Amino acid sequence: MNILTDPNKLKTSGCADVNASKCAEGDGEGSVQVQLDPNLNIGTAKVFSIYGKGGIGKSTTSSNLSVAFSKLGKRVLQIGCDPKHDSTFTLTKKLMPTVIDVLESVNFHSEEVRPEDFVFEGYNGVMCVEAGGPPAGTGCGGYVVGQTVKLLKEHHLLEDTDVVIFDVLGDVVCGGFASPLQHSERAMIVAANDFDSIFAANRIAAAIQAKSKNYAVRLAGVIANRSRETDQIDKFGERTGIKRVAHLPDLDVIRKSRLKKMTLFEMDHTPEIEAVQNEYLRLATELWEAKEPPVQGKPLKDRDIFDLLGFD
């Protein structure tokens, strides 16, 4: 019998469930860690994690990027890693039950869980999972990600997958919600052309760099979202070496697509919609064809990023 641990009972301070020496030498003394079980390797799929400031458009970006990969003929799985479980609703047209909801319903006896209980097919064949999370202020988000991957492997649902996209909540980069980085080969940060999201992006980049000491993940770059201009993002990139990999303009049709519970690939055809679709397809193609790891940038100290941004 496979009984999973209630996530509310997990320790969330210090180096819980981790090799302590690795913790100390990796992300720094006192960091909170969730150690990757070597048996939970996702396999041959290309794995991407999407981070960014809360409300910046990560779920919109993730869902449309998932569709873009599917339009290239790839088998795609999107995993939402937010207790709000709203990552995939433009793909599935509904709010899905989360992995944690399903596990709680069977008292964490995972052998009673069926794939159809937590995996749903969305637009253009994109498979969707909402990991969910423990109640606010309790438990560990990293546990949730780990158990989601474990269930997917137990049901052999990763064997026929080409691309996995983790859509990770807000700008939290604690040991728990940084755990998708342990599975990923590339991470991207969604940011607008403003101080707050670039400041958050800089701190996320530092977390990704810390994880890259012990894991294969590398920062692919910044996706400029909801931005007419990119001058501040580009200034940040010139200083840090973290490149901009895509530019998605501030278009009202993108907002409307969320209200219609649709991806941009389902919206009525217009020149501006086609331009954004093509940008997603270009990004998906570049990510799929990338042979060499990107050059690691050098995030700035908080004071330096504060002094850098703004108009002369």
From Swiss-Prot:
Gene3D superfamilies: P-loop containing nucleotide triphosphate hydrolases. Keywords: 4Fe-4S, ATP-binding, Bacteriochlorophyll biosynthesis, Chlorophyll biosynthesis, Iron, Iron-sulfur, Magnesium, Metal-binding, Nucleotide-binding, Oxidoreductase, Photosynthesis. Mg(2+) binds at S59. [4Fe-4S] cluster binds at C140, C174. It comes from the Bacteria. ATP binds at G55, I56, G57, K58, S59, T60, K84, N225, R226, P249, D250, L251. Pathway: Porphyrin-containing compound metabolism; bacteriochlorophyll biosynthesis (light-independent). Its EC number is 1.3.7.7. One of its GO terms (molecular function) is 4 iron, 4 sulfur cluster binding. Component of the dark-operative protochlorophyllide reductase (DPOR) that uses Mg-ATP and reduced ferredoxin to reduce ring D of protochlorophyllide (Pchlide) to form chlorophyllide a (Chlide). This reaction is light-independent. The L component serves as a unique electron donor to the NB-component of the complex, and binds Mg-ATP. NCBIfam families: DPOR_bchL. Homodimer. Protochlorophyllide reductase is composed of three subunits; BchL, BchN and BchB. This is Light-independent protochlorophyllide reductase iron-sulfur ATP-binding protein. The gene is bchL.
